[in-house]
Amino acid sequence: MRLYLLALNPTDSVTEGFLPAADRLGLAVTVLTDQPDAHRTAYRHLAAPPEVLPCEVRDFREVVGLVSRHHAPDAVFSNSDHLQTQTALAAEYFGLPAKDWRAALRAKNKAQLRRHLAAVGLDTVRAVELAPGQPVSGIDPPFPCVVKPREGVASEDVALVADAAELAAHCAAVRQRRPQDALVVEEFLAGELHTLETLGDGTRRHVLGGFRTRISPPPHFVEEALEFVPEHPRPVVDQVLAQLDALGVGLGACHTEFVVQPDGRARIIEVNYRAIGDQCDLMLARLLDIPFFEHVLRVHLGEPLPAELGARTGRHGHNRAVLADRAGTLTAAPAAQEYEKDGVQLVYRPFRTVGEHHVHHRTNRDYLGVVWAVGDDRRAVDGAVEAFLAANRWEITP
């Protein structure tokens, strides 16, 4: 059986998660990407590197054409935020299990997500969509408000602005970097930030738990740490699931970010119709002790999920980012490592290599690496992460 996997840049989710899972399932994998050299380099260490073909994956017509000229597909899949709609359309073209492309579009397009949830009467967030070049002076948002690229990721160019002057300045700065991108200006949804991780086969849906997310101080929204939450309060989960149902989310993994307000109301921040990233999906699989990546691939092959996943309970997980606090060249950092000590499994993965120079983004793009740990004792898990951070050093030279 052949799996076509669509990707932009290489990610740990694919390299460490989905490709090994595909190998365990006996699948032949063809990676379609617009960055073939980067993927071939990323997969050199794998026992069975996949076939990598260059393709304009942002255009579903190019995907359909290439697959039609190559081997017959059994599944078309992507874990990229940017490629869910294209993947859904290509899979549907070949009559394969597919996400509803409308749901994929609603999740990716933050303005459309707001409009749809308001139209079905589930949640109304005051939001304005700004087309490229559209004057900011003509809108009247509630301050403070959040400005974000309509189809952005990784908190990039997202900021909280306090007044009209800050709004104009931030929009102008973003448009210098990405002049062709539409923006969304929306009311600030205050509350503690959480995630809900779900897995569905189109009929049955499992809630895998979620995370409590610590973010950086305003005006930016950088995810600094995530702690596993086995079960959110049932009324909160029901509200989030109702909104996912209204959006049409059903097949595969979904990572939803939301806040809970003092009155218990759950307000969605964004829906990422794929597995959670930045090593959290790998941590989740280890934490729950389930073949998470295999389950995701199986549903895209048309197989139903089991009634019970057999997830391990009573464990704690802690994911912590190591962030650059300035621009410069990374001149010292620990290597990738993994070990178990005193009942705690700890993993560290670098996101930058020593010698790389980067600007300071003030987003998740500033991650130098991620350390995570899982175990039965929360204090031991948290302590292992703190001990690792204290024992290692990351140096940036301007």
Task: Locate the predicted segments by residue.
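A conserved helix-loop-beta module that forms one wall/lid of the active-site cleft
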Residues: 92-157, 162-164
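Internal nucleotide-binding/catalytic subdomain
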Residues: 158-266
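Active-site "cap" helix and flanking loop/linker of ATP-utilizing ligase/carboxylase catalytic domains
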Residues: 5, 234-255, 262, 272-331
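ATP-binding N-terminal substructure of ATP-dependent carboxylate-amine bond-forming enzymes
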Residues: 1-103, 324, 352-359, 363-366, ...
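Short, well-ordered beta-strand elements within core beta-sheets of diverse protein domains
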Residues: 159, 187, 285, 368-375
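Glycine-rich phosphate-binding loop signature in dinucleotide/nucleotide-binding domains
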Residues: 67-73, 139-141, 177-179
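Peripheral (often C-terminal) accessory segments that flank ATP-dependent C-N-forming ligase machineries
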Residues: 136, 297-398
